[in-house]
Amino acid sequence: TQIVNGVLTNQGVIPSTSPAARLRGGSELQPEESTNYTLGAYLSIGAFDVTADYFFINVEDRLNLSSDFTLTPADLATLTNQGIDASDISEFRFFTNQFETDTSGIDVVVSTDTEWLNGITNWQLAFNITTTEVVDRDPTLFDNDRVLLIQDGTPGTRWNFTANHNINQWRLLARINYYGDFYDNEAGGYFDDALLLDLEAAYTLDENMTFTVGARNVADEQGCSTSSCGTTPPSAFGLPYSQFSPFGFNGAFYYARFTYNLD
């Protein structure tokens, strides 16, 4: 049971070969077939180490859930004549192979070390851009909303920049994480991009003991709410934030850790 437009609705995932699914084009599932290519390079440019990787993945007969379907009175009558009572299913969907996607992207990592402030800082920038396109589909099984979820349901761009400074017995870390915007089909719209900051400090007491304190998402970023992002409805399943958020919606997380090495 799920909430659809504020109403409790019986909704389920049924076998693709069940009589109800066959009325909407369901069939036996087939193995996915994929072709992928990768190309990588490493460069040392002065004090900088650079790695770059390109990837391309084509998936035919891709497995995913279909769009949501309802049964008409004529459908219910057809199933009843087959001895099947489907009156308690208001909406349903099923797994299907009826679409094909192309996914491509680039990963770049740049790192270097700097001696300063009586210690050494390792700097690292990791960048990713990924795009997915639905290149073929059966529109009766896979509607435009499902296409948007596959293509834009995760951020197309992500990067993080990390500074890790070591000085005597101390290690200090700061990291900025960026997530691009993404689509949530349940909320009916796009959610804004976001920047998160992580901080950590560790002190090595001796060769066996280390004490660490830190915080993930220091600024307590929860992402924009469904209403502030302009999505419809103003909440999805009662959640004020997207259930698909790549960084969650619980905000800041603080921790302390003591490590003892038995060696």
Task: List each language-model region with its residue ranges.
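C-terminal beta-signal and adjacent terminal beta-strands/loops
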Residues: 131, 178-183, 202-263
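Repeated loop/turn-to-beta-strand initiation elements of outer-membrane beta-barrel proteins
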Residues: 47-50, 117-121, 169-173, 207-213
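Residues on the lipid-exposed face of transmembrane beta-strands in outer-membrane beta-barrel proteins
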Residues: 39-43, 108-112, 161-165, 199-203, ...
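Outer-membrane beta-barrel signature, preferentially recognizing the C-terminal barrel domain
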Residues: 1-51, 57-58, 84-106, 111-116, ...
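Strand-loop-strand
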Residues: 193-197
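Extracellular protease catalytic domains of secreted zymogens
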Residues: 190
